[in-house]
């Protein structure tokens, strides 16, 4: 039976562990890091065997506090507090249920309402950057650009600014059959508030959609919604289908794509780059750099990551189809791994970039399961900065497109999935550019 994690043990784990990712580039951390850090992660006390300052403070609270001690709540607060203290706003703790949901989502199996979000620092709220197809949120009328300002509705609502981003995010998550209630601000000046009560459900994520452009039958449009473990296969299906239909040019739409799993983006880029091309460079706090190049990748058949296998014969299989005949559509909500996708295709002169400057997130968060140490849950923290193959890093800056085109103002509040090809002026600009 798994144990609930003690606060002192979590504190030590947080001091030494390096973890796996969400909403950015994802890494699965296992034996390699354990070999690097050894068993010191799971030990308690200091090198002399005496209680640490953490142990002492926690035991004082447990012994003398007037209030009941909920260790799960304290774990969450401890990680958040440590993240705040070191300037890591992405640090977090997941209990067993939350970690199970997160793992399922990364494999394309979702329970919830079906939105992808980022933190909006300006308004201290949660910004919805995309609403997934066939999701409860889409059916309820939630729109990209909505700002979640309250969790709950009516008199029971709580301000996101007071809960904090991670705290509010957890209240949005939940399992099938439970109700998610929140209030959004939208419209001009965000003056309009809309309340939602949405039943959470199970749905399979559609990380890639595609179609032949209605305005040009020689152009295929592939929308990459996020990079999860389903994306490589769905991307190949999209490419093969469009090629079979006679398409000669391609638009890769990563507007509102928040990023995803590093293994996923590595596989997708491998289909369009040459073997030994640099995919990504990562640097830890010591400045140590790791360079990942295109090459065959083989996971164990039982590993969920086997969906991201790359056979040698599949490397560069679409390169000749897309080089000089494709464009990437971006906007301010194109983030993290989606920016890496954009920058790699730009650095190797595969695609033109059209749209607006991207979000600018070049940091890697890792999530480390505590099961190895006999505990439930997982912890997350920023472990590395990552850099594109050739260009300078874009963290905090974003990637400027080759052709800057703002989305028509009349479309700003329209669901991205409901904008037609004829209406989409950014898409039309990309089609005109690659068709010259």
Predicted regions, residues:
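Glycine-rich active-site/cofactor-binding loop and its immediate structural neighborhood
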Residues: 108-153
């Amino acid at each position: 039976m798994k144990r609930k994690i003690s606060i002192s043990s979590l504190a030590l784990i947080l001091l030494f562990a390096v973890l796996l990712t969400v909403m950015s580039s994802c890494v699965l951390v296992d034996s390699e890091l354990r070999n690097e850090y050894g068993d010191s992660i799971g030990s308690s006390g200091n090198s002399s065997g005496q209680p640490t300052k953490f142990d002492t403070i926690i035991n004082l609270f447990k012994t003398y506090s007037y209030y009941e001690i909920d260790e799960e709540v304290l774990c969450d607060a401890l990680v958040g507090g440590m993240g705040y203290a070191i300037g890591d706003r992405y640090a977090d703790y997941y209990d067993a249920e939350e970690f199970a949901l997160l793992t399922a989502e990364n494999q394309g199996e979702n329970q919830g309402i079906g939105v992808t979000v980022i933190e909006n620092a300006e308004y201290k709220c949660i910004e919805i950057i995309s609403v997934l197809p066939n999701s409860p949120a889409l059916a309820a009328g939630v729109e990209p650009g909505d700002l979640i300002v309250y969790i709950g509705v009516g008199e029971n609502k709580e301000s996101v600014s007071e809960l904090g981003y991670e705290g509010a995010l957890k209240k949005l998550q939940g399992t099938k059959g439970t109700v998610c209630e929140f209030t959004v601000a939208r419209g001009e000046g965000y003056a309009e508030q809309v309340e939602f009560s949405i039943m959470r459900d199970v749905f399979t994520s559609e990380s890639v959609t595609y179609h032949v452009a209605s305005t040009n039958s020689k152009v295929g449009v592939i929308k990459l919604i996020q990079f999860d473990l389903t994306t490589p296969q769905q991307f190949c299906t999209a490419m093969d289908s469009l090629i079979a239909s006679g398409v000669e040019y391609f638009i890769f739409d990563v507007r509102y794509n928040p990023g995803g799993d590093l293994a996923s983006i590595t596989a997708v880029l491998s289909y369009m780059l040459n073997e030994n091309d640099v995919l990504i460079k990562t640097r830890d706090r010591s400045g140590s750099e790791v360079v990942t190049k295109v090459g065959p990748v083989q996971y164990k058949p039982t590993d969920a990551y086997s969906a991201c296998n790359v056979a040698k014969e599949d490397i560069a299989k679409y390169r000749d189809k897309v080089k000089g005949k494709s464009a990437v559509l971006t906007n301010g909500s194109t983030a993290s791994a989606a920016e890496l996708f954009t920058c790699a295709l730009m650095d190797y002169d595969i695609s033109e970039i059209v749209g607006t400057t991207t979000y600018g997130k070049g940091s890697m968060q890792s999530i480390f399961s505590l099961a190895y140490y006999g505990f439930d849950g997982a912890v997350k923290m920023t472990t590395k900065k990552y850099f594109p193959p050739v260009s300078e890093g874009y963290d905090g800056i974003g990637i400027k497109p080759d052709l800057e085109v703002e989305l028509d103002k009349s479309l700003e509040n329209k669901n991205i999935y409901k904008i037609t090809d004829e209406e989409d002026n950014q898409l039309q600009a990309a089609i005109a550019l690659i068709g010259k």
